[in-house]
Amino acid sequence: MFKKKEQEVVSVEERIDYKYSEDRILKELAEYIDKTYNAHYSHNKFQATEFIMDSGHGEGFCIGNILKYSQRYGKKDGKNRNDLLKVIHYGIMALHTHDTQEKN
């Protein structure tokens, strides 16, 4: 049998003139997320985040981290941009949790 080809995330057929650098920021976000999979926490056999998500507390965990990093933004030297990337990453994880719960 043939395997269904996955859809591309970004359309290359039509070039959109983004006003707020969304294309560049989405690329940067993807690179940031990729790096989290190679971070020092990811080398452990079990991840705390996975335990939390698998035990049904993922949505609250993600929302809590969104609040934490949103409130911290602008208060930590040199890490402000990373705080915003973390907010978006936890937002994506919250969407994943939401979508997974909606399917069940």
Task: State each model region's role.
Residues 1-104:
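Intrinsically disordered, low-complexity regulatory regions
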